[in-house]
Amino acid sequence: MNKPKEKLRIGVVCPYGWDTPGGVQTHIKQLAEHLIQDGYRISVLAPVSDEENLQEDWVVPAGRPIPIPVNGSVAKVLFGPIAATRVRQWINEGDFNLLHLHEPAIPSLSLLACWAANGPIVGTFHASSKKRKAIYAIGPVLDPAVEKLSARIAVSELARTTLKDHFETDAVVI
């Protein structure tokens, strides 16, 4: 007798405020919707400012994001011990076959998930920037996380170059 195939469980981490418009959030939403249509079990962990108006039942709010000025813009991220506890709980309860972390080399839920996770981890890199002293200063903290990734994806050649310049590793461009 054939056993029915179990649906692959994929945990996706969005580093930026889910309810703030942005390219990373749109990328994650479209990918999640496509994977759900294909029969995968998807759970997205993200910072959320307004949980009451959250429309996607597959998004798990991790807490309110904190605005941080970066490169002339403001990134709404979540980081710290309370966020780390929520990340570990989400990973444990999700029992994921695979984790997909977006921007795993910035202080955010993605970095916390990388530190907490065991098993296959895919990292997608979106950012592109010139070499920055701050990255070199915290490189020893970030390097093990980047090295822990089973696979690395860059959304552009510029993002790939940024990854290579800062972490001396490579990624597949999609």
Q: Which positions does each model-derived feature cover?
A:
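N-terminal strand-loop element at the rim of the active site
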Residues: 7-8, 14-19, 28-29, 33-81
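Histidine-centered beta-alpha loop that forms part of the nucleotide-sugar donor binding/catalytic region
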Residues: 15, 102-103, 125-129
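Alpha-helix capping/helix-boundary segments
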Residues: 50, 105-106, 113, 158-160
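Short His-centered aromatic/hydrophobic patch
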Residues: 80, 101-107
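Short, well-structured alpha-helical segments in soluble
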Residues: 85-94
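Membrane-proximal helix-turn-helix segments that form the acceptor-binding/catalytic region
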Residues: 129, 135-152, 166
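Helix-loop-beta element that forms the nucleotide-linked donor phosphate-binding surface
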Residues: 148, 160-174
